[in-house]
Amino acid sequence: MEEVKQSRGVRDTSIALYKRHLNKLAMDITGKEYENEKFLKTKADEIIKYLDDKSNSVRRNFSASIMVALSPKQKNSPTDEYRGVYERYAKLLTEGQAKYLESKKDNKMNSKEEKNWISFNEVISLRDNLSKKLKKEGVKMTSTDISKSNFDLLQQYLVLSLYTLLPPRRNEYATMKIINKKEYLDLDESELKKNNYLINLSKTNKMFSYGSEKVKSKIEGGNNTINVPKELNSVLNLWLHFNKSDNLLVTQQGGMGMTKNQLTLLLNRIFKPKMISTSMLRKIYLTNIFGDEAERNNKKEKIAEQMNHSVSVAENIYIKDV
């Protein structure tokens, strides 16, 4: 996989995902960890049979990881030894992609989405109720301390604000670091690519920097920056008044940073008994924001950039008929 990283410029997160897929295949089929591409050739029949039992999206993702391993330097360039088996996996990927897009084309919810779906207005209402609770508890900028329960409430309020006062992104906020202007200007290109930052320029001015290696979709130029809107800036000021760590989101009042999985668990707790993740919030947001066809065409390109996905993904995957 080191060759893949050097030759293709693939992000570390993608490399880790490829490794997980290949190791799972090897463990499930041979009981041993993945060693090299010979396994993908000698066990091709078993691998394809194994993937035939999986969902379209799983089959598609595993096929992509296999093809990267068989053609590490660039796409569609395996050695002659692996050309035949590469084409078999390429066919599997193409068929999986076609079935996946076909299943999403009518924008109908699946059973899981139907069970957990709420409107965007309900998300807003929940956020506003948290704000009222905090005010009732006397949590404000002039407070000198905060209880553990109110600290948790405040973080819940922050999370819902992050995903409603800006077009909702994926789980990038989980590992985001807080830095000041000087620290930001001192960062080199590698650090900007590898990390996500909240840059605290002043009480009235902040921005987010999303690194190209920390997000799913490709970002040109290494990182993407977005100015924090006024209402979200006020929420952040209140949060930073009590959160003295350099982590935007924390697992406890002591300041330990979150993982992406922990952010998902926090969202599940906020929306309980509904199981709502960042992916579901993105679908809810886009379904709400795009009205008639004219309005949809005017908005979708700008929204897609802010949410870090393509317009086609917004149309085919995220926007749901309700």
Predicted feature locations:
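Non-catalytic DNA-binding core/recognition domains of DNA-processing enzymes
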Residues: 5-93, 279, 283
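Alpha-helix N-cap/helix-start motif at helix boundaries, enriched for small hydrophobics
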Residues: 15, 172-175
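Basic, Lys/Arg- and aromatic-enriched nucleic-acid-binding interface segment
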Residues: 123-171
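Active-site-proximal segment of tyrosine recombinases
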Residues: 174, 276, 283-286, 293-308
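Conserved tyrosine-mediated DNA breakage-rejoining catalytic core shared by Y-recombinases
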Residues: 176-230
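Active-site/catalytic core of tyrosine-dependent DNA strand-transfer enzymes
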Residues: 221-285, 290
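Catalytic-site neighborhood detector that most strongly recognizes the C-terminal catalytic loop/helix
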Residues: 291-294, 305-322
